[in-house]
Amino acid sequence: MNEKDVRLMNSIMSGLGDTTQGGAVLLDVKSTQFVRVSLVLLRGLSEELQMPGIFISVDRPYQYMVHLLRMHQINPAKLTFIDVISRFSGDRKEGNANVGFVDGPFHVNSLPEALRQWSATIDNGVVNLKNCRFVLIDNLTSLLTYNNYSHVELFLRDFIEMLKSNANVLAPLMIDQERSPLLYETAKSLCTKEIVMKEEMRQVPTAASGKPYLKVADFRYVQGGIQG
């Protein structure tokens, strides 16, 4: 990561605030930048803050992110991967990382319960929410390709409620407000903070909700940096 990428990371981490408090944080990110922001978040949370976390791959098989992390010298050792897409896509390549699989993106409602069961029954296995400090999903919006909106909304509510039961778990949720306004508004109602990655960075309260609101410069920091 170059200096511009680090500046972006620092801006986002500043917006997240006290990560020990956990909770769901909404990030308004252009869909073309999901991979870049994922890498920056994983660098900041996993390496800089040494937080063990879970990365849930919905958009692409988990091996893709493992490859990008290693290519950009971001150590995936503290990460556990939950792969939602590989069994559906038929990708069977090994990524040499801790990984658990669920039965495809059409069964998204089963994911929160699967995480609960894994955490309750496995002390030192692939997934243990009790040892997790954050959970990041690569592309929430892509779930709408495989499920109707009501199922995705139910998943999102159940997912955040599950994380609330593990009070210290942070959940950054990346959604493109312009492309998925309905999902964005649903997520906004469930989150404790909103980070809008457009225009100039400034800290102001949201007019409607009064929740903390952060604007980050429109990816000028990452131009010429990480290539997703």
Model segments located where?
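Loop/turn-to-beta-strand initiation segments
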Residues: 52, 78-80, 131-134, 164-174
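P-loop NTPase catalytic phosphate-binding loop
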Residues: 63-106, 110
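Conserved beta-strand segments of the P-loop GTPase G domain that flank and frequently precede/overlap
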Residues: 25-30, 55-57, 82-84, 136, ...
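Substrate-engagement module of ASCE P-loop NTPases
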Residues: 147, 151-179
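Phosphate-binding/switch loop-helix module in NTP-utilizing enzymes
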Residues: 90-158
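Short acidic, S/G/P-rich loop/turn micro-motifs used as interaction or catalytic elements
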Residues: 31-35, 61-62, 88-89, 141-149, ...
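Glycine-rich P-loop/Walker A and Walker A-like loops and their local beta1-loop-alpha1 context
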Residues: 2-68
